[in-house]
Amino acid sequence: MKIQQLIVFLFAVVLIDARTPKRYSELDIVMSTCTTFIGKYGTVCTSTGKRSTNWNCYCKTDAGFGTISDCLVRGFNNNTNIISKFTESCNMTESKFHAKYDKIQAEFKTNGTEYAKMTTKSSSGSKTSASASKSSKSTGSSNASKSSTNAHGSNSSTSSTSSSSSKSGKGNSGTSTTETITTPLLIDYKKFTPYKDAYQMSNNNFNLSINYGSGLLGYWAGILAIAIFANMIKKMFPSLTNYLSGSISNLFRKHLFLPATFRKKKAQEFSIGVYGFFDGLIPTRLETIIVVIFVVLTGLFSALHIHHVKDNPQYATKNAELGHLIADRTGILGTFLIPLLILFGGRNNFLQWLTGWDFATFIMYHRWISRVDVLLIIVHAITFSVSDKATGKYNTRMKRDFMIWGTVSTICGGFILFQAMLFFRRKCYEVFFLIHIVLVVFFVVGGYYHLESQGYGDFMWAAIAVWAFDRVVRLGRIFFFGARKATVSIKGDDTLKIEVPKPKYWKSVAGGHAFIHFLKPTLFLQSHPFTFTTTESNDKIVLYAKIKNGITSNIAKYLSPLPGNTATIRVLVEGPYGEPSSAGRNCKNVVFVAGGNGIPGIYSECVDLAKKSKNQSIKLIWIIRHWKSLSWFTEELEYLKKTNVQSTIYVTQPQDCSGLECFEHDVSFEKKSDEKDSVESSQYSLISNIKQGLSHVEFIEGRPDISTQVEQEVKQADGAIGFVTCGHPAMVDELRFAVTQNLNVSKHRVEYHEQLQTWA
């Protein structure tokens, strides 16, 4: 499946790069400034379209060239770089430009207004145009100036055509003529500076927005590149990491790479407020730093190089000006992030294989990028509304289709931000998931129709492509696996056991997981991830699921009244996903620690390593509450006899012997006594028989001291040691903390690998 994943990734990259957004060159900004300023006084060259320049007119006609060249020379202080770029666009030499310009200036000085229209502005703000009688003079006149082309910058700065041209308001304060002027229009450029500053700010803001958007993608590309490099090194040279066990390495690992952000809680949610409404998950310290830097960069990039231009002719108020600039910036930044957040949220993400990150890590980053992106879009919508209100364009603009779709996308994004809170995901994941998909569809479609006319539609196509390919690959996995008849039963009162015949080509991944669709009328649209093991004959996968709310509860209710609490249900399987931890490759000693229903994935990885290993020390520790929990994992525990795995099971509530009747039908644990014992003695007898049947397993009653256990294991290790865990979040966090506190106990490297997939 890695080929399909690579196609998804590369196709997205190609789409993003297919048509980059419009960037404004220095000449674009100059021409935009000049043509707008000239347009206040008259029409010299007609427009050929939005944000386009009538090059034919400005390069080849006397009126167009004479007017625009005067703006370049006097308005932009004869900037040689600008003039050079203009001449390239007009396919002329710089010497020809200067000669032609000097000729026009000489004609004007010699013949006054017979050659050019001279614009002035009265004190009342109305514009007057002094025009000479139609003369036969032309640019080819023999009276053209023969002066040096390098002198006209200073010569024309005090041209007699200059007028007082004071600006009495924002925008087009004069009333421009509608007819096209056929002779050069020479204008006073004393009040030109606000135009230069304003158009430099507004047009360059688009360029900076694209640069900063690329910078945000570059930031994540850098993070991914580091992760890919580290992962490739670990895979190609697995023993190399064992040398990274010195004080400096351990210092970074103890305080940066391994620990939770705040003391212990990483897998456990933190609580704010009442009823768990503001509960959330905090990633590791390193992941938090990565996210914080991203958030800070986004905030900086949203505001850098945005400021108020005094006497800005484009906007009537400061609020309108700054609102428009911030809206453009945040909108473009948000657009750049959309394909990335879709990619990070997909199950068939090729980057998982390259980086070695698990799905939970990508989902965590997906959520944070999504939060930042939606906030950018909300700021974009608010600031544009403020700007449009200030300029009086709001009501008209909101009737346009692209604005309606933009509003739809923004509203859906806001609902996604609210609806994706941990509170809703945990309370009813199925409802959350269905609503989430619907909202995302409208968010992306609305975003496309909003952005397509602005030149940014390709970003949405990239997002759609990533999403669509992910769905196609997922459907392909399901199709080739087929609809299989699974045997589903309730074990130990709180666990579902799902046995699914698998195709021969389907390779089980140690420590992996698969998504299951139950083909029941109200359940088939839902899919849930479960870790699995395989039978000894390798013809089935066996999945275990703790009965909670939602789909597992519905299945349990369906099975409860049936004989043996068992039924055959057709299922669709999507997978496998995940991979074993690197502890088996890197460490001479591996300790697998599972809690409750976290055992299947840990067990499969442990047994897989035992089959391949010859001289590694492998230990399996399983922490359960009650004896009855053993009932649904009996076959797997018995198989451990054939391996070199040292197994220990902690029973934290051994006095609770309820549910042991499920062992009575197991031949391995039949009572050895013929006495008619009391219920209590029968239970203890059965427990004794369980221990005898699993004599290769050490049973310890009580809760383990994880910190002490880790310290002992590290001290006893004769080489690098790795801890691999999955189970209750509190236990997992406790083990993580214990490992970070014992990195320096031994001279050997100590590793920690977490297989708990927390994404709901």
From Swiss-Prot:
GO MF terms, alphabetically ordered:
ferric-chelate reductase (NADPH) activity; ferric-chelate reductase activity; metal ion binding
Annotated signal sequence range: 1-18
PROSITE patterns documented for this protein:
FAD_FR
Domain FAD-binding FR-type, first and last residues per copy: 465-583
Q: Name the glycosylated positions.
A: 78, 91, 111, 143, 155, 207, 615, 744
Q: Which GO terms describe its cellular component?
A: plasma membrane
SS bonds (residue pairs): none
In the record, the note on similarity to other proteins reads: Belongs to the ferric reductase (FRE) family.
The lineage, from the top, is:
Eukaryota, Fungi, Dikarya, Ascomycota, Saccharomycotina
The molecule here is called Ferric/cupric reductase transmembrane component 1
Cross-referenced PANTHER family: FERRIC REDUCTASE TRANSMEMBRANE COMPONENT 3-RELATED, FERRIC/CUPRIC REDUCTASE TRANSMEMBRANE COMPONENT
Ranges where the Ferric oxidoreductase domain occurs: 330-445
Q: What happens when the gene is disrupted?
A: Leads to abnormal cell wall composition, decreased ability of adhesion, and hypersensitivity to cell wall stresses. Increases mitochondrial activity and shows abnormal mitochondrial morphology. Also results in up-regulation of the expression of the cell wall integrity (CWI) genes PGA13 and CRH11, enhanded secretion, and decreased ability to invade HeLa cells.
* Residue ranges that the UniProt entry lists as topological domain Cytoplasmic: 234-288, 346-371, 425-430
The keyword Acetylation is assigned to this record: no
